[in-house]
């Protein structure tokens, strides 16, 4: 479906943005999250300039995103290592099983 204009409220300001209908709930939640972040920053930093608050919030979000990407990369690397170890364990077990089967076959001849 194509994006449709949607009115949202962010930090007391009305914004009209285009959004696919199936993503409107996520957009509203994001707008609420941003509003809360801006309000928290305003209280914590005592900065009243909305533009400055928006830049600080954007930097914080970018930092959080970078941290999550790093965590995801580390997790994927860890999983790849575990999969390789599991594959090696399985291959070793199959080789040993094959050796045992070969020994048993020669005993019955």
Curated annotation (Swiss-Prot):
Which segments does the entry list as coiled coil?
Answer: 22-99
Gene3D superfamilies per the record?
Answer: 1.20.5.50, Cell division protein ZapA protomer, N-terminal domain
Could you tell me the Gene Ontology terms of the biological process aspect for this record?
division septum assembly; FtsZ-dependent cytokinesis; septin ring assembly
Localization, UniProt: Cytoplasm
Any one Gene Ontology cellular component term annotated for this protein? cell septum
Supply the InterPro entries for this chain. Answer: Cell_div_ZapA-like, Cell_div_ZapA-like_sf, Cell_div_ZapA_eubact, Cell_div_ZapA_N
| SUPFAM superfamilies in the record | Cell division protein ZapA-like
Q: Which family does it belong to?
A: Belongs to the ZapA family. Type 1 subfamily.
Q: What does this protein do?
A: Activator of cell division through the inhibition of FtsZ GTPase activity, therefore promoting FtsZ assembly into bundles of protofilaments necessary for the formation of the division Z ring. It is recruited early at mid-cell but it is not essential for cell division.
The name of this protein is: Cell division protein ZapA
